Each structure stands twice: as structure tokens, then as C-alpha cells.
């Protein structure tokens, strides 16, 4: 029975609009239509009628279909009749011919289980086996035995058939069997409004001023006109912007990238003081402590020591004993300057602390200095060259520092050749008028200045071997006497191959040389001479044996004894 309710789109075997077709898949035909038919369940759309296809000629079957859509394929339920009483094979003979199975059977699966079987049948006119093949094709869908066992109310066994006619002989893959469109069948009638659906003229978007029922507002819809929509769209560009959210945990982060903010962040601490983590102690090339002249020291009184950095550095030094404490003369309290700050920070504009220091030097000497040139010079050279000097001195092993202290000529040459001592601007190294003429003539290196300040000068009151009062510490003197009492060659003491094993390069790499001692060389030469003598003696013995065997062979050929 065809569903003819008002809400159904399928009426009297036709669909209410073009484009709707009954085109189920193989799984839908077996699992829904065939299974529900066998289980005596109701179908939502009765598009398949019950017809015995084996008792009717194929040309008459389209008129018996419940589908009147004009499609060129039809569906039928047929009770299965057996050819033999005790066999499952069906009888496919008709009054005008017979249906013959062709091709391979296809198993229909659903949820990874077999639910049915599909066969392809072709109609032949006449009696078997001399029938004439026609273009009528039918697909037979049968349910699997296990799936059939799931039906509890099964009373009769059906098979589902899909019938269509090909356009000609041979396979017709992809051929469409839908009904051809005819415009005359879908002419609208003003009197027919059965399936019309009422659509509101205006969309319902908001509610206001509705009556209240039990403290709950019951809102009535308000229609939004087209003019209101245009007004809302025009007000969007003038709408106020959305305020950005502020997070409390990021309040202290400086907002902005101005030069003042960056300078304050990098150069100033919370109290406005400039903190230099490196100490400013300086040493002469011969390893002695250098103390600036009192007149020069007076120009540095514009700096103030930070309150917390110097004690921290002193505590760190007291916790460890380094090789420098044993080999280098003890440093006085005045040897290490404290980190300083400018009283009037920013007095010279963009000139940094090194420019102000060079300006103080020029004032002390009575000369003028261009602060802009000094700023460019320090910015280009201070960060690179001074960092290299500082790391080369700070990260030396205690043994290398000892060798550099005893024979500092190599380090000074490297310092003067590779760094900016060769520059024509060497006059920037300010020396007091009474500086010693032989201060830098000594080929002494090895002890680099601890501070990164390039300004170096010599005070004549300090000479080699003096510190404060001009005397060495008792512990250092005793240690040197102990080292001098060790019986060893000078090469192993200060200029041995161990000192020249690692040569520091500009790229911070190391070239390794194999060093051998003089004693080992003498032993090796003596062993070579003994081995050469043994080899010569062995060669002479071999030659004598060869001559003997040659004479013996000659006598044997001649047939007479050797001594006769």
C-alpha cells in the first residue's frame, strides 16, 4: 500500500518534485527492504510490490510495478518456489522463455558480516538450451541463512528482484536508468496548495517587552525590517573598539621599545646604579700590580661603589684557593677597584661610561677628545677585543698561568700583534708624564688586566717583585725556594715541551704538538745504533754462508773433494 499522507513526498507511485528517485543500494535492499519484508515488519514507503516474476513475461513486469515515476528500473518481491521439493534451487522457467544466471555471484556484506547474495540473470526466449538472448536483465537478492535466522517472525521466504532493460547487446557500465525529464508533467497549478509550506516574510531575530508569567518573561517576537539591518551594518565601522585584557602578572614588564627604556633595563639596576660584574684590577706586563697615579685617581672619584656586588665577589673568592693565590704576589686592598656608577648618568647624552672615562683622561692631560669618536671606537672594539682578552686570561689553566708568569714574552707578543696595540691610535693608552721608560720593554706577557678598561699606565714607584711594601709573602717565598731546590733541568722547569704542547689560536682551537724530552732522544739514538750494529753483523754472516754454499755446489759438480 502506498503511503498517501499529506506529509509524504511519495504519492500514488510518484514523487512530489522532480529529481527524487527510488535508488537504494544493495545493502539497503537486503538489510532494510528484504529483511523487513521477511520479518513481517512495516515499510515506511511501499515502493516494492509482490509479483511472481517467473510467471510473467519481462515486457509486462513494468506495468505491475508500484513505482510510476517513469524510471526504467523496477523492483519486486517474489516468493521463492523450489525446482525440486528437497532442494534450494529455484525454478526460473517462464511461459515464453527462461532466466539464466550469468557472471559471478556477489556477497553482500554489512558491518563485516555476510547478509545476502546477489545474482545476475538474463532472459532467453524459447526453450533451453537453444533460447535467444534478450536485453532484459534482472538482479536477484537473497538473504543469507544466518541473517535469516535473526528474524523471529519469519513466515514466508522472499527474494527481491531489480529489473531493467539494456539499450543494446554487450556490457553497459554506467548507463543511467532514470526517467527522462518532461516539463509538462510539473506545470504548477494555482489551485493545488496541498504541499505548500508557509514561510514567514521576515526573520524572527529578537524579543522585547513581553508579558510576564510567574516572574518569567514571555517574549513576543518582533519583526526586523530591512531598514533596521542596513542601519546596524552602517553602525559597525563607528562602533567603539574592544579593550585589551590586562594581566596582573605582566604589570612589571616595560611596555615600549624606546631607547630610554632599553638603556634603563640594560645599564641600571633597581636603584639606578650601574653594575659591572668584572673587577677593575690591572697588572703590569711583568705580573706586578699596577696602581694608578693619585692625580689620575682623583678623576675617578665621580664613581661610587655599589653596595652589594663587591662583598659578593669577595665571598666567592674566599671560598676557593686558586693557583694565582700561590704563584702571584699577594694583592693589597687597593689592587681591586669596586664597581662604580655615574653620579650624573646621561650627562653627556648618548656617550657611554667608557667615553666619560676617556674624557676624564683627556682633561687630566690637558688635551681635547672627541666624545663621538670615542663612542664609536669603544662600541666597535670594546665588546669584541676586550671580551677576548678577558676570556683568554680568566680561562687559562693554572699551569699555563705559571708559565706565562715566568716567561710572559709569548703572550705579550700575541697581545701586541693580534689585538689593537698595532693601531695608530695607540696614543689612547694614557701614560703619566713620569712613567717608566722600560715598563713595556720587558717581553712579559701572561698576566692580562682583569678589568675590561683599555686605559693602562705605569707608575714608576712599582718595580718587579714589589707589592705594597715591596716584599713578597712568606708563603710564596718559601714555595719558590722549594721549587728551586728540586733537581731538574731548566727545560723541564719552565720551557719544557709541556708548556708548548697546546698553542692557543685566534679561533679558540688548539694545535697539538708531540713533545719529547732530550733524555728520551739520547736513549732512542743509542738503541738505534745497537740495532744497526746487530743488523750489520747479521748481514755479514749471511754473506759468508752464501759464499760457502756456492763453493760447495761448485765442488759437487766437478766431482772432487774441496781439500784435495
Curated annotation (Swiss-Prot):
GO CC, alphabetical: membrane; nucleus
Q: What induces it?
A: By cold, salt, drought stress and methyl methanesulfonate (MMS) treatment.
Instruction: Identify the keywords attached in UniProt to this record, alphabetized.
Output: Activator, DNA-binding, Membrane, Nucleus, Stress response, Transcription, Transcription regulation, Transmembrane, Transmembrane helix
Residue ranges of DNA binding? 115-172
Q: Where are the transmembrane segments?
A: 535-555
- Describe, from its UniProt entry, the tissues in which this protein is expressed: Expressed in roots, rosette leaves, shoot apex, stems and flowers.
- Molecular function terms in GO for this entry? DNA-binding transcription factor activity; transcription cis-regulatory region binding
Q: Where in the cell is it found?
A: Membrane; Nucleus
Question: Example GO biological process term?
Answer: positive regulation of DNA-templated transcription
Q: How does it sit in the membrane?
A: Single-pass membrane protein
Which top-rank group of organisms is this from? Eukaryota
Q: Which SUPFAM superfamilies does the entry mention?
A: NAC domain
Where mainly found?
membrane
Q: What happens when the gene is disrupted?
A: Stay-green phenotype during senescence, salt stress and oxidative stress.
Q: Which residues form the NAC domain?
A: 16-166
Among PROSITE patterns, the record links this protein to: NAC (PS51005)
Question: What function is annotated for this protein?
Answer: Transcriptional activator activated by proteolytic cleavage through regulated intramembrane proteolysis (RIP). Transcriptional activator that promotes leaf senescence by up-regulating senescence-associated genes in response to developmental and stress-induced senescence signals. Functions in salt and oxidative stress-responsive signaling pathways. Binds to the promoter of NAC029/NAP and NAC059/ORS1 genes.
Q: What is known of its domains?
A: The NAC domain includes a DNA binding domain and a dimerization domain.
Q: What is this protein called?
A: NAC domain-containing protein 16
| The organism of origin for this protein | Arabidopsis thaliana
Amino acid at each position: 500500500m502506498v503511503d498517501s499522507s499529506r506529509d509524504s513526498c511519495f504519492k500514488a507511485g510518484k514523487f512530489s518534485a522532480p529529481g527524487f528517485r527510488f535508488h537504494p543500494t544493495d545493502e539497503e535492499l537486503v538489510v532494510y527492504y528484504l529483511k523487513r519484508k521477511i520479518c513481517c515488519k512495516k515499510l515506511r514507503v511501499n515502493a516494492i510490490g509482490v509479483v511472481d516474476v517467473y510467471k510473467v513475461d519481462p515486457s509486462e513486469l513494468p506495468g505491475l510495478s508500484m513505482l510510476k515515476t517513469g524510471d526504467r528500473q523496477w523492483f519486486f518481491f517474489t516468493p521463492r518456489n523450489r525446482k525440486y521439493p528437497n532442494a534450494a534451487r529455484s525454478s526460473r522457467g517462464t511461459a515464453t522463455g527462461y532466466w539464466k544466471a550469468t557472471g559471478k555471484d556477489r556477497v553482500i556484506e554489512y558491518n563485516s558480516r555476510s547478509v545476502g547474495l546477489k545474482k545476475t540473470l538474463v532472459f532467453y526466449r524459447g526453450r533451453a538450451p537453444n533460447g535467444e538472448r534478450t536485453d532484459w536483465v534482472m538482479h536477484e537478492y537473497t538473504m543469507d541463512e544466518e541473517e535469516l535466522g535473526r528474524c523471529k517472525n519469519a513466515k514466508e521466504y522472499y527474494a527481491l528482484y531489480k529489473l531493467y532493460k539494456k539499450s543494446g547487446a554487450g556490457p553497459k557500465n554506467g548507463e543511467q536508468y532514470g526517467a527522462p525529464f518532461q516539463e509538462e508533467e510539473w506545470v504548477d497549478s494555482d489551485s493545488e496548495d496541498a504541499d505548500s509550506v508557509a514561510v514567514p516574510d521576515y526573520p524572527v531575530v529578537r524579543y522585547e517587552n513581553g508579558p510576564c508569567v510567574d516572574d518569567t518573561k514571555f517574549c513576543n517576537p518582533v519583526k526586523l525590517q530591512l531598514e533596521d539591518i542596513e542601519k546596524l551594518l552602517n553602525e559597525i565601522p563607528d562602533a567603539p573598539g574592544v579593550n585589551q585584557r590586562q594581566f596582573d602578572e605582566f604589570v612589571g614588564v616595560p611596555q615600549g621599545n624606546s631607547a630610554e627604556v632599553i638603556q634603563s633595563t640594560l645599564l641600571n639596576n633597581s636603584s639606578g646604579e650601574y653594575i659591572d660584574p668584572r673587577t677593575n684590577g690591572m697588572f703590569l706586563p711583568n705580573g706586578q700590580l699596577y696602581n694608578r697615579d693619585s692625580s689620575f685617581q682623583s678623576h675617578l672619584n665621580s664613581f661610587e661603589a655599589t653596595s652589594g656586588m663587591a662583598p659578593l665577589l669577595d665571598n666567592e673568592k674566599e671560598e676557593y684557593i686558586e693557583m694565582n693565590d700561590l704563584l702571584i704576589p699577594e694583592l693589597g686592598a687597593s689592587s681591586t677597584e669596586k664597581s662604580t656608577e655615574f653620579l650624573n648618568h646621561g650627562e653627556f647624552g648618548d656617550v657611554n661610561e667608557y667615553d666619560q672615562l676617556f674624557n676624564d683622561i683627556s682633561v687630566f692631560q690637558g688635551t681635547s677628545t672627541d666624545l663621538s669618536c670615542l663612542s664609536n671606537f669603544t662600541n666597535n672594539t670594546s665588546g669584541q677585543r676586550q671580551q677576548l682578552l678577558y676570556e683568554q686570561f680568566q680561562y687559562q689553566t693554572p699551569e699555563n698561568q705559571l708559565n706565562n708568569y715566568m716567561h710572559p714574552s709569548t703572550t705579550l707578543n700575541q697581545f701586541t700583534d693580534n689585538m689593537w696595540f698595532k693601531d695608530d691610535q695607540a696614543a689612547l693608552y694614557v701614560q703619566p708624564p713620569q712613567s717608566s721608560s722600560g715598563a713595556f720593554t720587558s717581553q712579559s706577557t701572561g698576566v692580562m688586566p682583569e678589568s675590561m678598561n683599555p686605559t693602562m699606565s705605569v707608575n714608576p714607584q712599582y718595580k718587579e717583585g714589589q707589592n705594597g711594601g715591596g716584599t713578597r709573602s712568606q708563603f710564596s717565598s718559601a714555595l719558590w725556594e722549594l721549587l728551586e731546590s728540586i733537581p731538574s733541568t731548566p727545560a723541564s722547569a719552565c720551557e719544557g715541551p709541556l708548556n708548548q704542547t697546546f698553542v692557543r689560536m685566534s679561533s679558540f682551537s688548539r694545535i697539538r704538538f708531540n713533545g719529547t724530552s732530550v733524555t728520551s732522544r739520547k736513549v732512542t739514538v743509542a738503541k738505534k745504533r745497537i740495532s744497526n750494529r746487530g743488523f750489520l753483523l747479521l748481514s755479514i754472516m749471511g754473506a759468508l754462508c752464501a759464499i760457502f754454499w756456492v763453493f760447495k755446489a761448485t765442488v759437487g759438480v766437478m766431482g772432487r773433494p774441496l781439500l784435495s
